[in-house]
Regions:
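FAD-dinucleotide binding site
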Residues: 3-7, 13-443
Length: 443
């Protein structure tokens, strides 16, 4: 399938024309271009647009039948729902803040606490004193994290091993809810260095911004990269629709796909790069959207019902985001992997039953349908977003280093302090394309 401007800024437009022509060639023919870009998510689209602006010819391929990667605004329930990325994190320096304005998509200040929250334990309300202890526990957890860096890295579980009970309790929802992984697996040093700052939310969907941003980028969808051969002076990408030859490649596929060796490399990647991939992993943060008619169960728009204790801490129900008749359930770690294996019907039914335990049988009566976004079972992602394993806080920076001036990796996994975000993915795609352009210029 091909797409030029139908789905979901050039400084030298004349020089960009060869890029448009090259990218439009059928993949079954051998393409001779400056760079082949693998993956049309935020990083790949940013790389392609930067290549256009720099006068670098390119071919952009994408295995899915759409662009956007792990940004996905679903409209099947009658309203826009982000099944993937939701927040424009560190919005004061995130490129998507400006891009949203450029493509005409509204953003608003907001975060997950903007509508308030109620805390539960296995569906039962948590007493006020316990809830207060949980909040103070989060403060204690952040204080402990400040003393950790790459030289003394530990997991969240190890960090709080001798801490007060409320701090121990706070570590579980932070790891499972924010990273999407079990606390014993996540590097504190890596997570603690990520950018902080104001968030913005997108009523029409983050995915809508990315769709519009990529609307004019030539891309071949439904094309699977199988092998990247970098044994010669350039690269040869073997796909299910023929080979693509280029002077360099930008690889933007998620870490989950790289670790599963869905894309192979010939020769094998250098040890430093291979170790970097090994040092990263994918969390399983996922979502389920539930549509209701009429009853709001006494919850205000944007309120969160948070499961802090009990068997499954770290999951929450986002009630009526943007005052719409939808509840979005957020859940991660091994619990998410378990639920995602149920498939859409089973996963939706499970979360509806959990909500019924909190708000009562009225939810069952008002329910009108649901959608499941189980990223750990998505073959093109195999997870929600990346995290560093304990002792591997330097893996992201190592992965970003070019290989033999022919291979560049880009995406949220190698975005340093901007990792785990769409903004970080964009920055790395842009940086990779600029780096290649600089190397290709006559000296």
């Amino acid at each position: 399938m091909s797409r030029t401007a139908s789905f979901p800024i050039s400084r030298r437009a004349a020089l960009a024309a060869p890029a448009l022509l090259a990218a439009g060639h059928a993949v079954s023919q051998t393409a001779e271009v400056d760079v082949v870009i693998i993956g049309a998510g935020a990083a790949g689209l940013a790389a392609a647009r930067t290549a256009q602006a720099e006068g670098v010819s390119f071919t952009l391929i994408e295995a899915r039948d759409r662009i956007g990667g792990r940004t996905l605004t679903d409209r099947s329930l009658g309203v826009p729902v982000d099944g993937g990325a939701t927040f424009i994190h560190f919005a004061d320096r995130n490129p998507w803040t400006a891009i949203a304005a450029e493509v005409g998509v509204e953003t608003r200040t907001g975060n997950w606490r903007s509508g308030g929250y109620r805390e539960f334990s296995d569906g039962a309300p948590v007493e006020a004193g316990v809830a207060s202890g949980q909040r103070s526990g989060r403060g204690g957890l952040w204080a402990l994290m400040e003393d950790v860096d790459a030289s003394n890295d530990v997991s969240f579980a190890r960090l709080v091993a001798n801490a007060p009970p409320e701090v121990v309790a706070a570590a579980q929802p932070m790891a499972r809810g924010a990273v999407g992984e079990e606390p014993e697996r996540v590097s504190v040093a890596d997570y603690g260095r990520l950018y902080d700052g104001p968030n913005r939310v997108v009523p029409e969907g983050y995915g809508t911004i990315v769709e519009r941003y990529g609307a004019g980028v030539p891309v071949r969808t439904g094309v699977f990269a199988r092998l990247i051969d970098w044994s010669g002076r350039g690269v040869r990408v073997e796909t299910d629709q023929g080979d693509i030859r280029a002077r360099a490649a930008i690889v933007t596929v998620p870490i989950g796909v790289l670790k599963a060796e869905k894309v192979r490399f010939r020769p094998a990647l250098p040890r430093e790069t291979a170790n970097a991939i090994d040092g990263l992993a994918m969390g399983a943060l996922s979502k389920i959207a539930l549509k209701f008619d009429g009853d709001r169960f006494g919850a205000a728009p944007d309120m969160h019902f948070v499961e802090l204790r009990g068997a499954r801490p770290g999951m929450s129900f986002e009630m009526w985001p943007f005052d719409r008749d939808v509840v979005v359930c957020w859940f991660g770690a091994d619990y998410a992997r378990e639920i995602n294996r149920l498939g859409e019907e089973g996963a939706v039914r499970h979360m509806l039953e959990r909500l019924v335990r909190i708000v009562g049988p009225e939810a069952e009566k008002a329910f009108r349908g649901g959608r499941h976004f189980g990223w750990s079972e998505d073959p093109f992602a195999l997870g929600g977003y990346s995290y560093a394993r304990v002792g591997h806080a330097g893996a992201r920076d190592a992965l970003r280093k070019p290989v033999a001036d022919r291979l560049w990796f880009a995406g949220e996994a190698c975005a340093g302090k901007a990792s785990m975000t769409v903004g970080g993915a964009h920055q790395t795609g842009e940086q990779a394309a600029r780096s290649i352009a600089a190397r290709l210029r006559p000296r």
